[in-house]
Amino acid sequence: MNIYMEMNKVKTSQLNNRLLSLDILRGITIAGMILVNNSGAGSYTYAPLKHAQWHGLTPTDLVFPFFMFIMGISTFMSLRKFNFEPSKAAVWKIIRRTILIFAIGLALGWFGKFTSGLSQGESILVAATHFDTLRILGVLQRLALAYGFAALLAVIFKSKYIPWIIAALLVGYQLLLKLGNGYEMMEQNIIAIVDKAIWGVEHMYKDWTPGGERIAFDPEGLLSTIPSIAHVLIGFLFGKLIVNNKDNHTRVEKLMIWGTILAFTGLLLQYGGPINKKIWSPTFVLVTTGFAAQLLGLLIWIIDIHKKHKWSRFFH
């Protein structure tokens, strides 16, 4: 996952032309994940380290989408060696990686149930066979599906069509949310309905509503994977922007401009579709990819242009 850049342009590895700044952004994101996952419990957790209960955005809500944005950039760089063609080698690599990440996510979910069962005094056999209540989806599964579909779209369609695909995914998803109670935290939410129909309640995450009721609602649901595919594709386009523009100043300028456009558009449209991580709303996609692009531009300006990188060794 390391990324190397050089000179006043950007230190690059000969094969992938990756930014050191991107590596630092990934490191910051991973550090954020560690901090959030070890932030305490309940009232002992600082408010900025909590997810928004429903609508809204906290610093914690930026961690997952930032990682997905970085994954989109890395996907562009990874697929360059296949010339973005749907060759057998490219498709097989995408499918293999998707299955592997998804399987790891399932395995971690199973292991959590296994250790929980042992701690409650269950036998090894009983603790190891709670498949009837194993959660199918999750964070790694979301990453796997978003990467897999986005990467396949990237090799099937020319890059000039990607913005249209992103728009279609986000607009189509917005219509589903509007028509299916998507912005309401309740069992009749279309996201919950689809997951119940496909997986069953036993295999879903149980979340708390703002009113204090616990219902079957998966924040990494199958339907809300649609906008996350668009999320990765936006990162993919920023990967193209970075590679096609060799001058660091140009990179910073374009990252800041497009990042501001995305963030401003998302903030403006939130009055018609609130920013919401748990349903991965279209405005959430726009705002978080915009912020991620701006942060990457800032890091390039600090690290690669002004060579202020001693502070970043912790994240490298």
Predicted feature descriptions by range:
Residues 2-316:
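Alpha-helical transmembrane segments and their immediate juxtamembrane cytosolic regions
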